Design a protein with these regions (language model features):
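Extracytoplasmic "Venus flytrap"
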Residues: 1-8, 12, 21-35, 46, ...
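Structural recognition of the beta-strand scaffold that forms the well-ordered cores
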Residues: 2, 21-23, 50-52, 73-77, ...
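Short, solvent-exposed amphipathic alpha-helices that sit
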Residues: 3-18, 98-102, 126-146, 160, ...
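Flexible loop/hinge segments that line or gate small-molecule binding clefts
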Residues: 19, 57-97, 108, 115, ...
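Hydrophobic alpha-helical
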Residues: 42-44, 48-67, 135, 150-214
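Hinge/cleft segment of the Venus flytrap/periplasmic-binding protein
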Residues: 127, 138-140, 145, 230-281
Length: 281
């Protein structure tokens, strides 16, 4: 879970009197540890699972086991490719809308003409593939003078993504802008721009919840935010209904928000990013 997601889930759990055990790997890309956490929870007879999976495909068998065992399960942020049903629900970000926001923003800052690179396209996460497809569809239809000259697959760590971005920004014939489709690729691209003194020269649009100061200072043009607090709140609300034998909506889709220097201090952004923590001892 993201911190915002945890906060939203904790608030609803407090209101509903649910006891929550929060567990996560020490590294964001530690797939085997996350799988192990879920397997152990099932072995111990947990009453429900809320999961933000590192990847989609490796979790299908484990989540099917949970469903077959009658354990209510809510998946947050990633579509596993298993249809929602009585014991399985999804709370997702509208990734197509995120790609559209990125496309229109890059078109605006480039004046409708230029070259861009897309980094962070992961074959393991459908979210980044959807963002990339939506981004390129909008550019092709509405901004034909903006050309995608480089596409790079996503890597799991920030240092790896930084190395990818450094290959792009170190070129003399570098692109006008980079669109980074994940948190790791956004951070890696930003660090590469700092390292090669290309801040401002190459525009960066990313997907990240925490890089606020670089947006405020102009180091990053903009980031697309997911409403992680609301995702956590909705996920725990669905879990509560499932545990009480009700039939909640099987899938919820939440809209992203484009964060720029112009709206970073707005009430809408503050509401999305402010964490209200409740601890049920």
């Amino acid at each position: 879970m993201w911190e915002g997601e945890h906060a939203g889930a904790a608030l609803v759990a407090h209101e509903k009197g649910l006891r929550v055990y929060y567990q996560a790997p020490t590294r964001e890309d530690d797939l085997s540890s996350q799988l192990g956490i879920i397997e152990r929870a099932l072995d111990r007879g947990c009453n429900g699972i809320i999961l933000s999976p590192v990847e989609a495909l490796p979790f299908r068998t484990t989540i099917r086991r949970a469903i077959d065992s009658g354990v209510p399960t809510v998946i947050v942020g990633t579509d596993l490719g298993i249809p929602p049903g009585k014991k399985l629900a999804y709370v997702l970000n509208n990734e197509e809308a995120g790609g559209e926001l990125a496309a229109r923003r890059v078109a605006r800052i480039l004046g409708g003409k230029g070259t861009i690179a897309i980094v962070g396209i992961s074959s393991q996460l459908t979210s980044t593939a959807t963002r990339a497809r939506s981004l390129e569809t909008v550019l092709a239809k509405e901004f034909p003078d903006i050309h995608v000259t480089d596409r790079r697959l996503g890597l799991p760590t920030v240092p790896q993504e930084q190395q990818v971005a450094e290959e792009l920004v170190s070129k003399d014939d570098h692109v006008n802008a980079i669109v980074a489709l994940s948190e790791a690729s956004t951070r890696g691209a930003y660090y590469a721009l700092v390292e090669f003194n290309r801040i401002g020269e190459i525009k960066l649009i990313g997907f990240d919840q925490d890089l606020l100061e670089p947006v405020r200072s102009g180091g990053i043009d903009s980031v697309i935010l997911q409403n992680t607090y609301e995702m956590g709140r909705r996920a725990m609300g669905i879990m509560d209904e499932q545990l009480r034998g009700k039939s909640p909506a099987p899938q919820v889709s939440l809209e992203p928000l484009l964060l720029t220097r112009d709206n970073i201090d707005s009430s809408q952004v503050r509401q999305m990013l402010t964490l209200v923590w409740w601890y049920d001892q």
